[in-house]
């Protein structure tokens, strides 16, 4: 998720830990569905961690790290509601078959589905997002992903600690799955 308004995502995080969502995830081979926060809403979730459900698994960085996070192949859906979801992620999402949903027209991206948020329809929106994420995971879980492509993405990451952490993870994945590529890591981690 990316944006500024944690309140919009509160119902979603509660829905993600429901038995119904868990069953949907398990039906396609996932262990569950998690929220990875980027940008301001990720920081907000991090600050409110004690009030969050287990669906929130952490803050991955600001809007400039979104491209690196997407290029890992671990993300199955981008959900945004404000303009800090930077333009430029569209080609990455297209190449990795990651659907995008925007809840506000300020966040609308090329090739993204626009679904205006409505408090009255929050449950339906959350269910739709869950179904879309599950379908994306099911379609992507066995796809090949060439870890060599990540080296180019890492060259643009400015923070040395972040670059080192991502490189370490990618090297571990490469060792486990061979030099030719790897499958979506979420297939193993849920």
Where are the model-predicted features located?
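Metallocofactor- and cofactor-centric catalytic cores in central/energy metabolism, strongly enriched
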Residues: 1-190
């Amino acid at each position: 998720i990316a944006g500024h308004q944690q309140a919009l995502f509160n119902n979603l995080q509660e829905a993600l830990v429901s038995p119904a969502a868990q069953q949907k995830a398990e039906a396609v081979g996932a262990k569950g569905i998690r929220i990875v926060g980027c940008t301001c809403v990720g920081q907000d979730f991090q600050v409110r961690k004690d009030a969050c459900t287990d669906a929130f698994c952490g803050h991955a960085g600001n809007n400039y790290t979104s491209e690196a996070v997407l290029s890992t192949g671990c993300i199955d859906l981008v959900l945004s509601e404000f303009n800090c979801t930077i333009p430029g992620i569209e080609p990455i999402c297209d190449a990795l078959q990651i659907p995008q949903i925007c809840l506000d027209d300020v966040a609308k991206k090329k090739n993204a589905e626009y679904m205006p948020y409505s408090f009255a329809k929050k449950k339906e929106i959350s269910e739709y997002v869950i179904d879309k994420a599950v379908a994306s995971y099911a379609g992507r879980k066995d796809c090949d992903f060439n870890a060599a492509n990540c080296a180019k993405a890492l060259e643009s990451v400015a923070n040395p600690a972040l670059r080192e952490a991502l490189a370490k993870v990618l090297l571990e994945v490469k060792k486990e799955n061979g030099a030719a590529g790897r499958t979506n890591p979420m297939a193993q981690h849920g």
